[in-house]
Amino acid sequence: MSQTYLSLTVELPEEASEAVQDLLHESGALGLEVRDREAPLMPGVRGPNPGEAIIIGYFDERDTAESARDEVASSFPEAKLTLDEQPQQDWSNEWKSLIKSVHVGRLWVGPPWDKANAPAGTVQLVIEPKMAFGTGDHPTTSLCLAAVDAYMAEHPGAAVLDVGTGTGVLAIAAKKLGAGRTVATDNDPISVELAQENQAENGTPDIEVSGKELTQVEGTFDLVLANILANTLIELAPLIVAKTKDRLVLAGVLSHQRADVEAAYRNLGLTVLTGATQGEWVRIDLQR
């Protein structure tokens, strides 16, 4: 383990605090600190001014921290950003307190240490988050799980593609709800390895999990899921649309990014459906 970790400090208007917290979470932060003007601070630690928020994301990899910084800068150009290196702390148990189980439709999704609390009668997914995104508790994942639950109820046996699978949670949910061919891809080798571990843990060995590019994935799919960041969704739009036979579900999009993402896919011939929102996050549903 590295002897240092990185802290990304974000200073910006307090009305954007929740959205920034969600974005840092999605971008791979191991933990977040939100400084409150009402709470006592350590000597020498600056609290926010009136109308200001200070959010600090903690990372153990420089590439991840720098990528998160760039995403925040792109989405919140008014933010002041500071990336610092700090002495390493023991994160081995601290991050577990940040992970919560969720109950979405027929699905219960949670970490191994909370499995005993899963309600009877639910379709249970045990997801070990480690360093990949997607345990169910983040709004973007919950929004996608609801879409998977609804689609699979009406289309048993549907072929499903999960782009940017992270922990594999969406692909595993689809398979456990009755999907046919299920493919999960991610360009992060750590995510691929973890998704394969979660696949084995959940008894879904026939999901095709790999680091393949979309151009290497054969066939088209009834349901395509892509819970990644808005800029990447726009960049990959032609490839994602080419794999979509019926329904496309996009997430990882903040409300102010919605119009641009929808336009990219509408221009490729898809029809925008109602979708869903949770806080500052939106889910965009499209039809071939």
Curated annotation (Swiss-Prot):
Pfam families per record: PrmA (PF06325)
Binding site for S-adenosyl-L-methionine: T141, G164, D186, N227
One Gene Ontology molecular-function label: protein-lysine N-methyltransferase activity
Job description of the protein: Methylates ribosomal protein L11.
Main location: cytoplasm
Gene name of the record: prmA
Keyword NADP tagged: no
Location(s), subcellular: Cytoplasm
Catalytic activity: L-lysyl-[protein] + 3 S-adenosyl-L-methionine = N(6),N(6),N(6)-trimethyl-L-lysyl-[protein] + 3 S-adenosyl-L-homocysteine + 3 H(+)
Primary enzyme class: transferase
GO biological process, one term: methylation
Enzyme Commission numbers on file: 2.1.1.-
Protein's recorded name: Ribosomal protein L11 methyltransferase
Keywords noted in UniProt: Cytoplasm, Methyltransferase, S-adenosyl-L-methionine, Transferase
InterPro entries: Ribosomal_L11_MeTrfase_PrmA, Ribosomal_PrmA_MeTrfase, SAM-dependent_MTases_sf
Matching PANTHER family: ELECTRON TRANSFER FLAVOPROTEIN BETA SUBUNIT LYSINE METHYLTRANSFERASE (PTHR43648:SF1)
GO cellular component: cytoplasm
